[in-house]
């Protein structure tokens, strides 16, 4: 497919997509009703031809988004605040970036520099006390990473744990505790209680009197599970207190739903595994900076006499095609498109190639040779935050989605 024309299929959907329930896996009924109305005014197409076009568009769009089937998010799906904040930081919108910096979140420059996809995973609520350890001091977490595509190469992974300030004891502000993260090398059933076989991945000595998220590098374990296809027995988290006055072991580190502080915020404060990967298509998640968010519509200045090749406004609203149930952000974006004449002689501002100049020259004396065409000459990427077909939250960079410049080619 010609680069730059992929996203134009979204617009073409409103002209060609029509089919029965058997072909509705990607485009829901709301979008198809709009298409049917448009086709009714345009004369429509034969049913068989429309079904075939629908299948072709569906397969192409699924491949473009890296999905096996259309996501059908459940009502219980949770979008971690971290992923929303990461999207805002990556999008580079100044007003939102200032708000995020106010809560102390920093953009992960190093992991993101080698990735075009960020995925988040919650453990499967299969929380187990590790045999032989102190009560509530060590836990094992199982993260199901089977939804990561085979062609996606993981470069790094991190485990995020939320910890709350400890205010128990007369000298609580002098205390420290250590958080150790291990990879479980063998399942608990195969080892003697109290002697779980693990390897240390990361450790941190933290002060009691701070409330914040802690990030731990678990890349070695995740790379073993994804690249080397080794069995995934999960991660073990151990909290060791170094202060003489005993506190409620582990209860200030949010690794359990049954904390006395309440479970209403558990969905946002539970442990989060984040992977950074690249599927081999396009560039990494480079951080963009923009002064202001682009408005939904950009009316062009009146150019009654100028019909030459130029960029025109084209806003793609994901709700129009029924994708707003699984695309979290953005709600839509300004894609733009190129349209206009490429008259002889070609002016410098039409951004023409030498071949286009020669072709236009020949066309001026031989009309059987077509004129040069007005096409995109520069395209840029957008970031999308969405729920995949497994209800996992994904932040992905998609190339060639926005027309930045047009020219005669």
UniProtKB/Swiss-Prot annotation:
Residues annotated as signal peptide: 1-24
Record keywords: Chondrogenesis, Cleavage on pair of basic residues, Cytokine, Developmental protein, Differentiation, Disulfide bond, Extracellular matrix, Glycoprotein, Growth factor, Osteogenesis, Phosphoprotein, Secreted, Signal
Gene3D superfamilies, A to Z: 2.60.120.970, Cystine-knot cytokines
Disulfide linkage: 309-374, 338-406, 342-408
Annotated positions of the Phosphoserine modification: 91
Residue positions the entry lists as glycosylated: 144, 209, 351, 366
GO molecular function: BMP receptor binding; chemoattractant activity; cytokine activity; growth factor activity
Main location: secreted
Region entry Disordered, spans: 284-308
InterPro entries membership: BMP4_TGF_beta-like, Cystine-knot_cytokine, TGF-b_C, TGF-b_propeptide, TGF-beta-rel, TGFb_CS
Domain of life, source organism: Eukaryota
Positions of the propeptide removed during maturation: 25-293
SMART domains xref list: TGFB
GO BP, one annotated term: hematopoietic progenitor cell differentiation
Assembly behavior: Homodimer; disulfide-linked. Interacts with GREM2. Part of a complex consisting of TWSG1 and CHRD. Interacts with the serine proteases, HTRA1 and HTRA3; the interaction with either inhibits BMP4-mediated signaling. The HTRA protease activity is required for this inhibition. Interacts with SOSTDC1. Interacts with FBN1 (via N-terminal domain) and FBN2. Interacts with type I receptor BMPR1A. Interacts with type II receptor BMPR2. Interacts with FSTL1; this interaction inhibits the activation of the BMP4/Smad1/5/8 signaling pathway. Interacts with SCUBE3. Interacts with TGFBR3.
Primary role: Growth factor of the TGF-beta superfamily that plays essential roles in many developmental processes, including neurogenesis, vascular development, angiogenesis and osteogenesis. Acts in concert with PTHLH/PTHRP to stimulate ductal outgrowth during embryonic mammary development and to inhibit hair follicle induction. Initiates the canonical BMP signaling cascade by associating with type I receptor BMPR1A and type II receptor BMPR2. Once all three components are bound together in a complex at the cell surface, BMPR2 phosphorylates and activates BMPR1A.
Protein name, as recorded: Bone morphogenetic protein 4
Organism this protein belongs to: Bos taurus (Bovine)
Record lineage: Eukaryota, Metazoa, Chordata, Craniata, Vertebrata
């Amino acid at each position: 497919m010609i680069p730059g024309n992929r996203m134009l299929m979204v617009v073409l959907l409103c002209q060609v997509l029509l089919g029965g329930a058997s072909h509705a896996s990607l485009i829901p009924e709301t979008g198809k009703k709009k298409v049917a109305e448009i086709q009714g005014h345009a004369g429509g197409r034969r049913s068989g031809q429309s079904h075939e076009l629908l299948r072709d568009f569906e397969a192409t769009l699924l491949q473009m988004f890296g999905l096996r089937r259309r996501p059908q998010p459940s009502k219980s799906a949770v979008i971690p605040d971290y992923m929303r904040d990461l999207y805002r930081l990556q999008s580079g919108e100044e007003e939102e970036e200032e708000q995020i910096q106010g809560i102390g979140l920093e953009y992960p420059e190093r992991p993101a520099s080698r990735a075009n996809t960020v995925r988040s995973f919650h453990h499967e609520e299969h929380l187990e006390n590790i045999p032989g350890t102190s009560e509530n001091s060590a836990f094992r977490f199982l993260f199901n990473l089977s939804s990561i595509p085979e062609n996606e190469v993981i470069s790094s992974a991190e485990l995020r744990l939320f910890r709350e300030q400890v205010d128990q004891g007369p000298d609580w502000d002098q205390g420290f505790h250590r958080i150790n993260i291990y990879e479980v090398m063998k399942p608990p059933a195969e080892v003697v209680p109290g002697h779980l076989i693990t390897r240390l991945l990361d450790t941190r000595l933290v002060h009691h009197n701070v409330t914040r998220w802690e990030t731990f590098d678990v890349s070695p374990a995740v790379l073993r599970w994804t690249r080397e296809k080794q069995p995934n027995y999960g991660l073990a988290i151990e909290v060791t207190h170094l202060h003489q006055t005993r506190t409620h072991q582990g209860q200030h580190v949010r690794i359990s739903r049954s904390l006395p502080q309440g479970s209403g915020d558990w969905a946002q404060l539970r442990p989060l595994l984040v992977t950074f990967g690249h599927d081999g298509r396009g560039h990494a998640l480079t951080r963009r900076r923009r002064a202001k968010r682009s408005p939904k519509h950009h009316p062009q200045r009146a150019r009654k006499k100028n019909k030459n090749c130029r960029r025109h406004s084209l806003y793609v609203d994901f709700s129009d095609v029924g994708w707003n149930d699984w695309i979290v952000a953005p709600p839509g974006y300004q894609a733009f498109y190129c349209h206009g004449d490429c008259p002889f002689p070609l002016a410098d501002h039409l951004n023409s190639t030498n071949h286009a100049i020669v072709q236009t020259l020949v066309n001026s004396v031989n009309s059987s040779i077509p004129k040069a065409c007005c096409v995109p000459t520069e395209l840029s990427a957008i970031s999308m935050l969405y729920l995949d077909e497994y209800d996992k939250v994904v932040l992905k960079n998609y190339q060639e989605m926005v027309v930045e410049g047009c020219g005669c080619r």
